[in-house]
Amino acid sequence: MQPSEDALVFIVDDDAGVREALAWLLRSRRLPSESFDSADAFAAFLNASSRSAWCPSQPGCLLLDVRMPGMSGLALFEQLIERQLLNVLPVIFLTGHADVPTAVDAVKRGAFDFCEKPFSDNALVDRIEQALQRSATTLQVQRAKQTLQQSLADLTERERDVMRLVVEGLPNKLIADQLDISVRTVEVHRARVFEKMAVKSAVELANLLRGE
């Protein structure tokens, strides 16, 4: 994957040496990162009303230590589950041997993956890039849905009526008969629907509405 320029990797670990090593590794792969020394600090960052480093419209992933003083990595993970952020912000747990079963259970509950310390640099970077790809794909789907909803909201009631019948495959003459309007009026509404929905054919319109 070629990471997006605005992608950001978050590092949450209480060990300064681990944070510095990971930040250096990511810099060497041209992956921007932001480090936090505790889960509490990262939770406060997420809850801040104004943040300049990241927003949910930006691809990202989280490298999260399992055991830390104060809030544990698992407790922070629970918050991300509650806020439905795991697809936008995939979590890769960093774990010692003793915590592997816990990390495996977290993966079953939605974490992207876990890496056991000491980890292979290349293997970790590969998983980070895959996590960023998931994040970017999720955001792309979300934006497409938002665009679709806005386009639908821009349609008039009559345009929605025409669109429904167009998608059902009815020709203009039958649409005109069903709606008790002229064929010319159907053609005008049909053209406006295509323009507002940014499609060029009835098939493309149907696929768009089905999310294909």
Where do the PLM segments sit?
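Acidic, metal-coordinating helix/loop segments flanking the phosphotransfer/catalytic sites
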Residues: 35-61
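Acidic catalytic/metal-coordinating carboxylates
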Residues: 37-38, 72-78, 201
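Active-site residues of response regulator receiver
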Residues: 64-65, 95
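Receiver (REC) domain active-site loop signature in two-component systems and cognate sites
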Residues: 68
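Short amphipathic alpha-helix used as the core "switch/output" element in two-component signaling
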Residues: 74-87, 105
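C-terminal output helix
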Residues: 101, 115-128
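Basic, Lys/Arg-enriched C-terminal extension of HTH/homeodomain DNA-binding domains
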Residues: 191-212
